[in-house]
Amino acid sequence: MSKRTVKVGVAGRFGPRYGVTIRKEWSEIYKQKIALYTCPSCKKKRVKRVANGIWQCRHCGYKFAGGSYTPAYEIKVVEG
């Protein structure tokens, strides 16, 4: 079998569709979304995403709001 996901990782499921740049960007965001993060309450690396902006620790059950793809979201200021 061919190695379809060498360049783009999990975005290989899209095949040749959508272009390589969009697939690489989607792959990076998807990896951030499914990664385990450190709980602010018990300090264990067991936090998973429940829904958009909702995160829950699988060890202590602590549920909190955060960013869409990572628990700690960044606020960017645009000067214009």
Swiss-Prot record:
One of its GO terms (molecular function) is structural constituent of ribosome. Binds 1 zinc ion per subunit. Its cofactor is Zn(2+). A zinc finger (C4-type) spans 39-60. GO terms for biological process: translation. SUPFAM superfamilies: Zn-binding ribosomal proteins. HAMAP family: Ribosomal_eL43 (MF_00327). This is Large ribosomal subunit protein eL43.
